[in-house]
A protein has these predicted regions:
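Short, acidic, small-residue-rich periplasmic hinge/interaction motif at the N-terminus
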Residues: 26-73, 110
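Conserved C-terminal beta-signal and adjacent last beta-strands/turns
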Residues: 196-198, 202, 207, 251-253, ...
Length: 695
């Protein structure tokens, strides 16, 4: 990786913005202390992810978690996924391919998580989270709202186990302009800025961040090439022992403008020079440097005074996504040998493609019936996968013949052997929901959403939520919901070296039942307890089918998980806050590709040492992880990782912070398949220092 360079235009913009906005900084503002919210503020915190209107998390018709910008600062999070790891029921698993952070809810696969940024799904048509997914910088985040449980009745596809909506800092929310820099381990360097203004009655918001890192490079003693291929074919092509290289760059720019009922948002994200470290097969790849870019343009209209009992919301979203593997994935190293011969350049696989989506949705809220609030609406989505380019020097040629070992790259684009066909998917959706206050302290929410897909059919997903304000200290909820995951293009249409597609697939399904309690015995102590039953069906996996030469994607099997999520918040004093959570999952005996930990725990303390100093300590414990079916390796041992962040705010302008991650330098590993026998080592002790200036 080349070293980080601050773009001169970026610095110039920071300087110009500081000159133009100094007058907007209120020098009489109180000094902000970046610790977790007081318990009173936490209880009254309102969310919108579970309903059309604002509700406190305890009264929302779902199991809700909220992470604020203050939480992000206090804990030293620099990426979205740093913060998600601290939520009960969520585990962020590091994937060996590209060091991607994959978000798992309640022991489900990451493909069953819906992640949105300002309501825009971050999923793509082929790879789920995206082949080069790396999270997002926290400098642009205002808050994160999370549903632990099904979300398809609200958001449609993929919210089987949970839904996350990241709300960025937009027009009207940025009260101070800010510029900051951060430097740390692994030659990591970051610069960011944000600016809010009002121009001729139009509220303007702007954020930008540049990021560059060489990444932590874990030692892989034995990769798949050494463990399997070299053993099978008596060769010595492996690059192990060797380091998996995980460097990458990121540029993130976001603009918003708002006036009256209208809001415009434009986001651009580019990840470049992204080293994948290990291929999807678990083979060291020091060559690949991929990149992707995403552009979103969103227009929103909101009118809460359309009529006496009516509101109107409309949105039009345009999205573009493209990615490519640069000079190609080195699927196997130079000198690789199999029963077809020897490949002097190794196995090279070049992928490029683009996607564009157009989404229109309109909804209204009617409150003209006593004690009822009825929301209904619908919309249309068009998703177009185009510009698919695929070249490789192995496998099957477009005419169905074998590509001879040692051949140059062959263009598979447009053939049935390309990694994906160029296709357009159309989705029509309709939703209806009623919230009924049928008695004092009782509220029933009932609704459903219908989605019709042009390539696999339709699905309807209901939800019911009964919320009872049991006492002035206790809130009880009983929640039922169904959800689905749409089959990906790869599962429906693409033949790979490992599996055949199946155009007759049904969506994966789930049914979830939650029993939740929120109890606040005093103003200083809050306890949340959630019991859940999570049943999945029609799971899509590769299985052997009689008469076929390869495994094929099929709907097969059920998987049930029962669990408990317990969390507590204690404001011990005005200076000290303590919070903790514990998750227990009890899956059935069904096999899963990679098992998740059954037990997880988290502890956090925030201590305001003085009017200028704040100190955060947090620790995460991940229990032992069972191996997948046919994996005879020992169970992977538990690990605990502690982080600490010390922040100093000199005035309402300057702030400084130092953060140490994996403070005790624990030897922690992420579970992998058998292709990486020693699993994936996680980063050891690392640190960063940052400075930010408000104006």
């Amino acid at each position: 990786m080349t070293k980080f360079r601050l773009n001169s235009a970026f610095l110039g913009l920071c300087f110009a913005t500081s000159l133009s906005s100094t007058s907007f900084a209120d020098t009489n503002d109180k000094l902000e202390h970046f610790i977790s919210l007081s318990l009173e503020d936490l209880i009254s915190l309102e969310t919108t992810i579970a309903t059309a209107s604002k509700r406190t998390a305890s009264k929302a018709p779902a199991v809700i978690s909220v992470i604020t910008a203050d939480d992000l600062k206090a804990t030293g999070a620099t990426n979205l996924t740093d913060a998600l790891q601290n939520v009960p029921g969520i585990h962020v698993r590091t994937d060996a391919f590209g060091n991607r952070p994959l978000v798992h809810f309640r022991g489900a696969n990451a493909t069953q998580t819906l992640l949105m940024i300002n309501g825009n799904s971050m999923r793509d048509l082929i790879w789920g989270f995206g082949i080069f997914w790396k999270g997002m910088p926290v400098s642009a985040i205002e808050r994160i709202e999370i549903i632990r449980g099904p979300g398809s009745a609200l958001f449609g596809a993929d919210a089987i186990a949970g839904a996350i909506n990241v709300i960025t800092k937009t027009a009207g929310q940025i009260k101070h302009s800010e510029a900051g820099v951060r430097t740390g381990s692994f030659n990591t360097r970051t610069a960011w800025m944000q600016h809010g203004d009002n121009w001729r009655g139009i509220e303007i918001g702007f954020t930008a961040e540049l990021y560059d890192t060489e990444g932590y490079n874990p030692l892989i003693p034995v990769d798949r090439q050494a463990a399997f291929e070299d053993q099978t074919f008596a060769s010595n092509a492996t690059l192990s022992p060797g380091n998996a290289q995980y460097g990458w760059r990121n540029q993130d720019v976001r603009f918003s403008a708002a006036k009256d009922h209208w809001r415009l948002q434009a986001d651009y994200t580019r990840r470049s020079d992204l080293e994948i470290g290990l291929t999807g097969f678990g083979v060291l790849d020091p060559v690949t440097q991929g990149n992707d870019e995403r552009f979103n343009l969103d227009l929103f209209y909101n009118n809460d005074t359309l009529g006496k009992h009516w509101t109107l919301d409309a949105e039009l979203r345009l999205q573009h996504l493209s990615y490519n593997s640069g000079n190609g994935f080195q699927e196997r190293p130079p000198g690789y040998t199999d029963n077809t011969g020897t490949y002097p350049d190794g196995l090279i696989n070049i992928n490029r493609s683009s996607e564009r989506s157009i989404i229109f949705e309109v909804s209204t809220l009617y409150s003209g019936i006593k004690d009822h609030s009825i929301r209904l609406g619908g919309g249309h989505t068009s998703q177009d996968l185009y510009s698919v380019k695929h070249l490789q020097n192995f496998g099957t040629a477009p005419d169905g013949s074998d590509i001879i070992a040692g051949s140059p790259l062959v263009d598979l684009s447009g053939s049935s052997y390309a990694f994906s066909p160029e296709k357009i998917r159309h989705i029509n959706q309709f939703f209806l929901e009623d919230t009924w206050n049928f008695a004092p302290d009782w509220e029933l929410t009932a609704g459903a959403r219908y989605d019709n897909y042009s390539d696999f059919g339709s699905t309807t997903n209901p939800r019911l939520a009964l919320v009872w304000q049991t006492t002035n200290k206790l809130t009880s909820k009983l929640i039922y919901g169904q959800a689905f995951r749409a089959p990906s293009y790869q599962e429906l249409f693409v033949e790979t070296s490992r599996a055949l597609p199946n155009p007759d697939l049904n969506p994966e399904r789930s049914e979830t039942l939650d029993l939740a309690f929120s109890y606040s015995s005093t103003k200083n102590w809050l306890v949340n307890l959630n019991l859940f039953y999570f049943d999945q069906s029609d799971l899509i996996s590769r299985i052997t089918v009689a008469g076929l030469s390869k495994k094929q994607f099929q709907n097969t099997g059920n998987y049930t998980i029962r669990g408990v999520e317990l969390e507590t918040h204690w404001q011990a004093s005005k200076q000290l806050n303590i919070s903790a959570n514990y998750t227990l999952r009890n899956p059935d005996s069904s096999s899963a590709p990679i098992q998740k930990a059954k037990k997880e725990a988290y502890l956090r303390t925030d201590w305001k040492l003085s009017s200028h100093w704040n100190w955060n300590i947090q620790a995460s414990w991940i229990g032992e992880r069972l191996r997948g079916a046919n994996d005879t390796r020992d169970t992977l041992a538990p690990y605990a990782i502690a982080d600490t962040t010390l922040r100093y705010a000199q005035s309402n302008t300057w702030e400084f912070a130092v953060s140490i991650r994996n403070l005790l330098d624990k030897d922690a590993k992420e579970i992998t398949g058998r292709s990486i026998p020693g699993d994936l080592p996680l980063a050891g002790r690392n640190a960063y220092a940052e400075a930010r200036y408000k104006f």
